[in-house]
Swiss-Prot record:
Gene: Ptp99A
S-S bonds: none
Tissue specificity comment: Selectively expressed in a subset of axons and pioneer neurons (including aCC and RP2) in the embryo.
Cross-referenced InterPro entries: FN3_dom, FN3_sf, Ig-like_fold, Prot-tyrosine_phosphatase-like, Protein-Tyr_Phosphatase, PTP_cat, Tyr_Pase_AS, Tyr_Pase_cat
Domain Tyrosine-protein phosphatase intervals: 476-741, 764-1016
Catalytic residues identified in the record: 682 (phosphocysteine intermediate)
Residues making up the signal peptide according to the UniProt record: 1-28
Predominant localisation class: membrane
Role, per record: May play a key role in signal transduction and growth control. May have a role in the establishment of the intersegmental and segmental nerves.
Organism: Drosophila melanogaster
Catalysed reactions listed for this entry: O-phospho-L-tyrosyl-[protein] + H2O = L-tyrosyl-[protein] + phosphate
Subcellular locations according to the entry: Membrane
Protein name as catalogued: Tyrosine-protein phosphatase 99A
Biased amino acid composition, Low complexity: 33-63, 1107-1130, 1162-1188
């Protein structure tokens, strides 16, 4: 036997002897099973020690032999010796005991791993502890391998109890961490397991760090894995980025020591697509092409590849030219082409790999451009250039003379007006003063330092923003610093702001108005010229000069100047983005009347109406000039609307951009096209003001050009007012808001859009993905995850810290302020609702404490009490609920059709204060008997709240989830549709998820909201308006139709009003034609149905037409009317079979669409004979289970008939009804086509002779007023019917209905 094998056998024998001595010292021996391998010389019997507790009086044995330390380490680490041959494995457990120095016992701290913006903190690691330093009461598995002959020993598959390893010791560091392969987005590496594992290695943590950003990947280890080399590929990395990689092993208890750090840079990625800016004919055989450098590339651009081919052919020619990343544009001439041919050209950039210099990384190709080569094109281009120059010269001369003429006209008008009007009066409708400002083409790419700033395509903007966020937002810092440095210039003076008499008009000393763009006030009689000052500047919008006026929050001394500016500049919209007081400091003074009328200088301001919403308030103000001579066809009174955003936090930026985007869109759209600029102000008129203006401009740029250029536009408008977008945080918020706007699209939907989108599954799926994009981290739900609070949570829905409801804390009791409840906003208030779970037995008092603390007088309970886990949590008549501070008593109970109302009173124990509470219990929400019941329930809740509106509405369902949030959303959207005529389902759903993640489980939850909204009646009257009376009739009550109100008060010319009136008359004519067509259809339908019924009666040996068929027929399309029972007159014959028992069809009442599906399914199955067996089977099929509609959206749904739960229908005449329905539906389509043609002819006639139609429409309506029916069906775009007659027909045959539900 070779010498090394002798040594290995001796070492194994020595190990067994040492363990036997330990067993003798402790006077206890526990034999273990030995290997039954036939190749083993003899089975081993190894002793182990029993557990020793801390209370044991005997001292543990001390082993200090250095040789034992080394040999035991070899045993614990089975990979210490793997060479050998011929041995089969033995694996045995050893219970070892030694004394451990308490000074060396340190708990291994877990590394603090943050998100993409946090760094890994260096933690103290325990020192290397020899493997012999093991404690009692811990089982250490020791795999043993023997050697004999020339065979290789293997370890057995036994699974030792690794969980018993001492928690104080961790695995050593992984060894030989090596990089194997690198690409642009991945790094492949390998490493060996730790030498000292100290337990079963459950896996590895792979940390990848670049700058301040740390990511971690988990590599799980298989249960019985004995791999000596681990491979892993890091993916989704950034191209051309330096990464540092560290690997740590971990067991089920602890994380091990870090490996040696290794640094690696990823490879470059492909550049983005260049943009071809010029493609022209150079000669009849050559083309000139010019392109712009890609806006995104890594390291450098080494060359370009130009692909050319004849249009329509597959073969192409590649041309490669060297390039430099410093060149913004590149041009070349493509020669040797064919005359009179079309060529397709595209360009791509490429760079060499930094990992493998021989490898080429090709970027994206530009969009293909097509050009035609023509003879003599080289002669045409100089002629075009010369003509262009001559044209420019002519235009320049024309502009100069035109300007000179305009100046003369203005001077003559000025002298004439001074002569005609007294000097003590102002002058009406003077043109606003728009001074000349430096013009900058901000859409052209610019070079700042070594970087190019250009517009970004919409489809790549999210990626662009993500790159700016990388490395701790370093990209934003560089861009904002470039803007700050460039906009500091002495070339833009502010001399008027520094005038001694004007300094007091500045709220802040450093916020002044540039002279070249400031707003000039018209001088008053006897006023000095330098007193035309106000701290305000004209600011450009997107493709519109002087679209905005940016100004500071008015001071009391400047109220008169502010309102003079509003009047003189024809301002219709004021945007205010600040509160009067923030953080205890005065930010703006109240420059409008609190109620009634206030006079500021020569302008009188009257508050007409104030509409308060959750995030902003709209005020309607009437302004009147007191020193203006009223001229013919001119008003001295105008309406101005103030949009006041009230939810901008005192410090920083809003939590989410959706409310801000909605505010920007609505306030900007309210400004009439022919009105003056929008006045925007915050406190200083620079930070939030600039954010608003940039958002509005970029939203319009996205809509018109599908590109975004925040950098260029902000750089442009900063030359018009200083410090716009005042902080880097606001600059970042701008980009994040635009990313959200691009992802969500237009979310304010009209009623007809809600109807269309409720059946658009791809749209709902995409919305759902965007809604649940936010995933909370531990810091967001820290209170909910505390151990003391975990028993207060029913499920996995937790409140976010910033929106959770707080209880009055109890001194010295941790977690006493926690309840699983969240604040949700409604249409009116930010804290309109409290959504919470069904109280558990140990949280009932917490629930009533919450009601008491927050003065909630309305509780809506949506969970049922069927389950024992969801028991009653309110007091009954005999047993009140008492706490240290209050007592809850039951008052009375009222049963309604779909819900139960209970009244309670909460009395204070310390004083006489008491709080009345009404609980509305509706366990069937939202699957009530019919849609009208849904809205009746909502109206009842809001009527209660209008009477007692001191606190929020508490909404309770089982887990505080989808049911409760659906109620909040529907309640808010119903008011929004009444006020704004739009519904923003996406905004409510996403903000609810952000405040209470997990409430939406699928896109079907979002579909439920759309389904309910689609049946929203128009007379909910949920708004409780606070309109103030006025002295003129046209604005007695303000309405959301801001444009029409502005038009009626002199801010828009009369021809616009006339156009609106003409359009209204046209709509009346169309409605009249629709009514006539519907009457004709009804008459034809009745005649056809009578004829069909008569034919059926003659051919079918039936005693009578079953009257129970009438309700079913009323659910068919509008052309199918109920059959008249009087039409069946044929007497029965002797051979008439016995009538079949009536077939009961169960109609679930979950939604009208489900009802339509069941009716249509019944009609579809009518072709097959129905037997009593099948009828009974159909009758008993799960009457309470909702059915998912599978029919196309064209199937008509009848809200008025959805309340019928069950119908009894016989089989007689069923085939005839089905055939007639198909024929009549085809006839209806023909009638609708004829109606559309008549409407088109009417439109053409109106466009030709609008005045004639205007005069005749009144007579036309009067002549037909007496002939119109009292209730005629209205056919909508989706073939829905709303007809009281149909409902009455169904009610007439109520005796034929078999109500089952």
């Amino acid at each position: 036997m070779p010498r090394p094998q002798h040594h290995a056998l001796l070492r194994a024998m020595l190990k067994l002897l040492l363990f036997a001595s330990i067993a003798e010292h402790c006077a206890t021996a526990l034999p273990t099973n030995s290997s039954n391998s036939p190749s083993s010389p003899s089975p081993f019997t190894v002793a182990s020690l029993p557990p020793t507790t801390a209370s044991s009086s005997s001292s543990p044995a001390v082993i200090s032999t250095s040789s034992f330390d080394r040999n035991l380490a070899d045993l614990v680490n089975p990979e210490a010796e793997t060479s050998g041959s011929g041995w089969e494995s033995l694996e045995t457990e050893f219970n070892l005991a030694t004394t451990v120095d308490s000074s060396t016992q340190k708990t291994a701290k877990e590394p603090v791993l943050g998100t993409a913006a946090t760094s890994i903190e260096q933690q103290d690691q325990p020192p290397d502890v020899p493997a012999t330093t093991l404690a009692f009461a811990n089982a250490f598995p020791v795999p043993v391998a023997g050697e004999m002959g020339n065979g290789n020993g293997n370890y057995n598959d036994a699974t030792p109890p690794y969980a018993a390893v001492d928690d104080n010791y961790v695995p050593s560091k992984p060894q030989n961490l090596t990089i194997l392969d690198v690409s642009a987005n991945s790094i492949t590496m390998s490493w060996h397991p730790p030498k000292n594992q100290n337990g079963a290695i459950a896996g590895y943590h792979v940390f990848h760090i670049h700058d301040n950003q740390t990511g971690v990947e988990i590599v799980k280890n298989s249960r019985n894995s004995v791999e000596t080399l681990i491979h892993f590929e890091l993916q989704n990395l950034r191209p051309y980025t330096d990464y540092r990689v560290i690997v740590k092993a971990f067991t089920t208890k602890n994380e091990g020591e870090p490996s040696d750090q290794i640094a690696q840079r990823t490879d470059v990625g492909g550049p983005s697509a260049p943009a071809i800016v010029n493609l022209t004919c150079h000669s009849q055989e050559s083309i000139t092409i010019r392109w712009r450098r890609p806006y995104e590339f890594y390291n450098t651009i080494d060359f370009y590849i130009i692909k050319t081919r004849l249009a329509g052919q597959d073969t192409h020619r590649d041309i490669r030219i060297n390039a430099s990343a410093k060149e913004l544009e590149t041009a070349m001439i493509l020669q040797n082409l064919t005359t009179n041919s079309y060529y397709e050209v595209k360009v791509a950039a490429a760079t060499f790999s930094v990992i493998n210099p021989k490898k080429i990384v090709l970027g994206k190709f530009s969009e293909s451009r097509i050009i035609q080569l023509q003879p003599n094109c080289e002669k045409l281009q100089p002629l075009l250039r010369q003509s262009h120059n001559d044209y420019n010269l002519a235009v320049l001369v024309g502009i100069i003379f035109s300007c000179f003429g305009i100046i003369l006209i203005i001077m003559a008008f000025f002298l004439w007006s001074r002569k005609c009007f007294h000097a003590a009066y102002y002058y009406l409708d003077d043109p606003p003063h728009h001074p000349n400002a430096p013009q900058v083409d901000w859409e052209v790419p610019v070079k700042i330092g070594d970087e190019i700033r250009a517009a970004v395509p919409v489809n790549e903007f999210a990626k662009h923003v993500a790159s700016l966020h990388a490395d701790g937002d370093i990209g934003f810092s560089r861009e904002y610093e470039a803007i700050q440095n460039e906009c500091i210039s002495d070339d833009l003076p502010c001399e008027h702001s520094q005038h001694p008499e004007n300094k007091r008009k500045n709220r802040y000393l450093n916020i002044t108005a540039y002279d070249h763009s400031r707003v000039h006030l018209h001088p008053t009689p006897g006023q000095k010229k330098n007193l035309d000052y106000i701290n305000a500047n004209f600011i450009d919008g997107y493709q519109k000069g002087h679209a905005f006026i940016g100004t500071q929050g008015p001071l009391p001394d400047t109220f008169d100047c502010f309102w003079r500016m509003i009047w003189e500049q024809r301002v219709a919209i004021i945007v205010m983005i600040t509160n009067l007081v923030e953080r205890g400091r005065r930010k703006c003074d109240m420059y409008w009347p609190k109620d009634g009328v206030e006079t500021y200088g020569v302008i009188q301001v009257k508050l007409i109406e104030e509409e308060v919403m959750s995030t902003y308030t709209v005020r309607t103000l009437q302004i009147k000039h007191l020193k203006l001579k009223k001229k013919k066809q001119c008003n001295t009174e105008k309406l101005v609307y103030q949009y006041h955003y009230t939810n901008w936090p005192d410090h920083g930026t809003p939590d989410h951009p959706l409310p801000v985007l909605n505010f920007v869109k609505k306030s900007s759209a309210a400004n009439p096209a022919e009105a003056g600029p929008i006045v925007v102000h915050c406190s200083a008129g620079v930070g939030r003001t600039g954010t608003y203006i940039v958002l509005d401009a970029m939203l319009k740029q996205i809509q018109q050009k599908n590109i975004v250029n925040v950098f260029g536009f902000l750089r442009h408008i900063r030359a018009q007012r200083n410090f716009l977008v005042q902080t880097e945080e606001q600059y970042i918020f701008l980009h994040d808001a635009l990313v959200e706007a691009i992802a969500s699209g237009e979310t304010n939907l009209m009623a007809e859009q809600v109807e269309e989108l409720k059946n658009c599954t791809p749209y709902l799926e995409q919305q759902y993905k965007n809604i649940i994009q936010f995933q909370p981290k531990d810091i967001h739900i820290a209170s909910a995850m505390k151990q003391v609070n975990s028993i207060k949570n029913r499920g996995a829905i937790f409140p976010i810290e910033g929106s959770r409801v707080h209880l009055t804390p109890k001194p010295g009791e941790d977690g006493s302020d926690y309840i699983n409840a969240s604040w949700l906003h409604g249409f009116r208030r930010l804290r309109d609702f409290i959504v919470t779970q069904h109280p558990m037995a140990h949280t009932i008092k917490d629930f009533w404490q919450m009601v008491w603390d927050h003065n909630a007088q309305t509780v809506v309970l949506l969970s049922s009490l069927d389950d024992i886990n969801f028991a009653q949590f309110w007091p009954d008549e005999a047993t009140p609920i008492e706490s240290d501070h209050y007592r809850v008593k039951f008052l009375n109970k009222t049963n309604k059709s779909d819900y139960v109302s209970r009244d309670f009173v909460i009395q204070s124990i310390q004083d006489d204060y008491e709080l009345t509470v009404k609980m509305l219990h509706c366990p069937s929400w939202p699957e009530m008997s019919n849609p009208n019941s849904i809205y009746d329930f909502i109206v009842d809740v809001h009527e209660r709240c209008n009477d007692y509106r001191n606190g929020p509405i508490v909404i309770v369902d089982r887990y505080g989830g989808a049911q409760a949030c659906t109620f909040c959303a529907i309640s808010s959207l119903a008011i929004e549709m009444e006020y704004c005529s739009t519904a923003n389902v996406y905004q409510y759903a996403k903000l609810y998820h952000n405040k209470r993640p997990g409430v939406w489980t699928s896109s079907e939850d979002i579909r439920v909201i759309y389904n309910i909204l689609s049946f929203l009646p128009g007379n909910l009257n949920l708004l409780k308006r606070t309109a103030l009376r006025t002295e003129f009739e046209d604005v007695t009550t303000a309405t959301p139709d801001l444009y029409s109100k502005i038009c009626s008060n002199g801010n828009v010319p009369q021809h616009v009003i006339l156009q609106q009136q003409q359009l209204h008359m046209l709509q009346l004519q169309q409605q009249h034609l629709e009514t006539q067509q519907q009457q004709q259809q009804q008459q034809q339908q009745q005649q056809q149905q009578q004829q069909t019924a008569l034919n059926e009666t003659v051919s079918t040996p039936s005693t009578d037409t079953n009257p129970s068929l009438l309700p079913i027929l009323s659910l068919l399309p509008p052309t199918v009317a109920p059959l008249s029972s009087s039409s069946s007159t044929t007497p029965p014959t002797p051979s008439t079979p016995t009538p079949q028992p009536p077939q009961t069809i169960q109609l679930s009442s979950h939604s009208p669409s489900d009802l339509s599906h069941q009716i249509s399914s019944t009609v579809a199955n009518a072709a097959s004979p129905v037997t009593p067996a099948t009828a009974s089977a159909s009758a008993g099929a799960t009457p309470t289970t909702p059915m998912t509609p599978t029919v196309p959206p064209t199937i008509p749904t009848i809200p008025s008939l959805a309340s019928q739960n069950s119908l009894t229908l016989t089989n007689a005449n069923f085939h005839t009804v089905t055939n007639n329905a198909a024929d009549l539906m085809e006839h209806q389509q023909q009638q609708m086509l004829a109606l559309m043609q008549q409407q088109t002819q009417l439109q053409q006639q109106y466009n030709t002779h609008p005045q004639q139609h205007h005069n005749n429409v009144g007579d036309l309506l009067m002549n037909n007023a007496d002939n119109s029916p009292t209730a005629s069906p209205t056919i909508t775009n989706n073939n829905h019917i709303t007809n009281n007659n149909v409902t009455s027909a169904a009610a007439t045959d109520a005796q034929n209905l078999d109500i089952v539900g």
